[in-house]
């Protein structure tokens, strides 16, 4: 029937369970349609068999024929839909061009307005997905979101102007006002945050989370930016990671394969490549340098152009600008370095104050802590070389070794406390715990062994053995080899002690030589060599004399043999064979003397006086001329007697 010119149809024979109110109520055949509700001018005008549809508004679902389960609320909502099913359109012109597309939702003025056959799209907001035609499985929430999309599928846009310019790109996610707003064909991007990736056009595979993250990116691909303004200036660079507030914020179009994690990390990077910055402000000032690794708050913060550096720890390599190939691991390690290169620092405060010194290695807490400009030092151990400032080419291994050295160079110290007190002394060698530990300014000492030259303060000494020259303080040019050799000497000089506990006759002796374990010297300018009874004793520039004191001898018997033996000895002239001519002995047996020599043959002497012939380690037989001397004495006595008779 009609009420005031408005037609009302319900429960018609073939229009079961339906209600239609319109001034043009259902001119179609209404064949077998059921459970439909239509209110508005020309609603269901062409409906034939479609069921479960709801159309509210001027020309809502006006050309629907067989489509079912559609809901259209608003003027011209789903206006062109004919066979599409399960669509929901709320708002003027929402889904107005849809013909056969199904399972679409358009809420808002012009939402998904031009969609024709697209399916499973969700558009919520004025003009959301406005130009979409065949794109499928898109979600657009917010005014003008994905407004330009035509065929792009599997996109998600939430926020005003999100993915606004997208046309054909797929698999993008944009959440936040203007996020990915300029994107046209870039795909597989994720942008979350206001203006995140706002300028992106064709860049793909990017992730931007945070306000203005990757804001300027246009074609850069495979970037990850997480944090407000992270990588905000990046345009075309790819394969970078920036995580944290302002991470990689100024990188433009040159840097690739950078990783920045932490607020302001790699903040000023422009064209530097292959950098890793982890921590607050790590490598914040870097611009063009590449292949750096900075881990820790403020690590390599001031670096601009220095490449191939590794810094790990709070403020490690903090002030470095152009220095390259440095390694700093530990809190404030190498933190003062500026332009120096090829340094290695491992440990808290290692090489802390180094500025321009190069090729230094410091391993241990406070190792080379005070070094500034010195080069080529090696310090291994806590506080090793910790006071060094300008001394170069030192090697210090052991806790507190060369701890006080400042300007001394070319020293070697191995062992805890070795050369501990050295300040300016140079060219010293100390191997062993506390070796040369009291040396301050003197040079050219060599101490090998625990406690060797423990209190020495003068130079040009050599001590090899535990506690060798242990008490020597002002002595110089001394040599001691053996455990506790020269251990009683304090101020003597030019002494030589060889053998375990070989010592001088007094603490201040000079020019004394003692060779033999447990021997005590004979005084200034003497030499004492041999076993406990002594073998030789020489004084001043005199010839060697044999120790012959009756008080140290026993079993004394006469030996009157002389002339008979001496007469049998043949004195020969000869030459020594060359190395190539010696065949029966090793080449080590050669004696490098040229010309005619005078002497005896050991094998001939052995037949006469076997006791004076000894076999050396090389197999060569040698003659001891001292014993022959005593036979000569007897021979002279015999001749004298014969002459007198």
Regions found by a protein language model. Give the residues of each.
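Glycine- and small/polar-enriched repetitive beta-structure motifs of secreted/surface proteins
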Residues: 1-548
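C-terminal intramolecular chaperone/autoprocessing and neck/assembly modules of extracellular spikes
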Residues: 1-16, 524-626, 635, 639-645
């Amino acid at each position: 029937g009609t009420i005031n010119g408005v037609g009302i149809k319900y429960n018609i024979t073939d229009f079961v369970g339906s209600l239609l109110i319109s001034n043009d109520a259902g001119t179609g055949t209404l064949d077998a349609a059921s459970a439909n509700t239509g209110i508005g001018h020309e609603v269901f005008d062409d409906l034939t068999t479609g069921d479960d549809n709801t159309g509210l508004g001027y020309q809502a679902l006006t050309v629907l024929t067989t489509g079912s389960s559609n809901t259209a609320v608003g003027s011209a909502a789903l206006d062109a839909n004919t066979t599409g099913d399960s669509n929901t359109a709320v708002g003027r012109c929402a889904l107005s061009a849809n013909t056969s597309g199904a399972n679409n939702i358009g809420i808002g003025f012009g939402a998904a307005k031009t969609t024709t056959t697209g399916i499973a799209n969700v558009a919520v907001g004025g003009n959301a997905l406005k130009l979409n035609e065949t794109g499928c499985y898109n979600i657009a929430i917010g005014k003008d979101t994905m407004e330009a999309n035509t065929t792009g599928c599997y996109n998600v846009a939430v926020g005003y102007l999100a993915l606004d310019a997208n046309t054909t790109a797929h698999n993008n996610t944009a959440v936040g006002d203007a996020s990915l707003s300029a994107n046209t064909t870039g795909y597989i991007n994720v942008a979350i945050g206001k203006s995140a990736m706002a300028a992106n056009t064709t860049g793909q595979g990017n992730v931007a989370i945070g306000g203005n993250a990757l804001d300027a990116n246009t074609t850069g691909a495979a970037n990850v930016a997480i944090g407000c303004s992270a990588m905000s200036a990046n345009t075309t660079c790819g394969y970078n990671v920036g995580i944290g507030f302002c991470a990689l914020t100024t990188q433009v179009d040159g840097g690739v394969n950078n990783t920045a994690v932490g607020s302001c990390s790699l903040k000023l990077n422009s064209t530097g490549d292959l950098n890793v910055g982890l921590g607050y402000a790590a490598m914040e000032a870097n611009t063009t340098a590449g292949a750096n690794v900075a881990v820790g708050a403020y690590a390599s913060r001031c670096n601009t152009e220095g490449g191939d550096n590794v810094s790990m720890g709070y403020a490690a390599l903090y002030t470095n600008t152009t220095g390259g190939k440095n390694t700093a691991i530990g809190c404030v390690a190498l933190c003062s370095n500026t332009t120096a290169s090829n340094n290695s620092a491992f440990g808290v405060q290692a090489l802390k104050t180094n500025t321009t010194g190069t090729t230094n290695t410091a391993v241990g807490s406070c190792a080379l802590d005070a070094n500034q400009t010195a080069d080529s030092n090696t310090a291994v151990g806590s506080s090793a070389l910790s006071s060094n400032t300008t001394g170069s080419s030192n090697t210090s291994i052991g806790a507190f070794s060369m701890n006080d050295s400042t300007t001394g160079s070319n020293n070697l110290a191995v062992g805890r406390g070795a050369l501990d007190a050295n300040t300016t002394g140079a060219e010293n060698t100390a191997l062993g715990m506390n070796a040369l530990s009291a040396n301050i300014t003197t040079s050219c000492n060599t101490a090998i062994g625990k406690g060797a030259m423990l209190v020495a303060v003068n130079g040009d000494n050599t001590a090899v053995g535990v506690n060798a020259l242990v008490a020597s303080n002002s002595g110089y040019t001394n040599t001691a080899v053996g455990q506790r050799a020269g251990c009683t000497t304090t101020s003597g000089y030019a002494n030589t002690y060889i053998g375990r506990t070989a010592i001088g006759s007094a603490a201040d002796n000079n020019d004394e030589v003692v060779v033999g374990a447990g021997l005590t010297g004979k005084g200034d300018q003497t030499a004492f060599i041999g076993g406990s009874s002594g073998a030789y004793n020489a004084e001043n520039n005199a010839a060697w004399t044999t120790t012959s004191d009756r008080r140290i001898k026993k079993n004394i018997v006469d030996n009157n043999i002389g002339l008979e033996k001496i007469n049998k000895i043949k004195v020969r002239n000869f030459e020594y064979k060359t190395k190539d001519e010696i065949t029966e002995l090793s080449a080590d047996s050669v004696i490098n003397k040229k010309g005619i020599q005078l002497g005896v043959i050991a094998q001939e002497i052995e037949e006469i006086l076997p006791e004076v012939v000894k076999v050396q380690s090389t197999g060569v037989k040698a003659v001891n001329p001292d014993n022959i001397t005593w036979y000569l004495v007897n021979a002279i006595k015999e001749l004298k007697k014969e002459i007198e008779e």
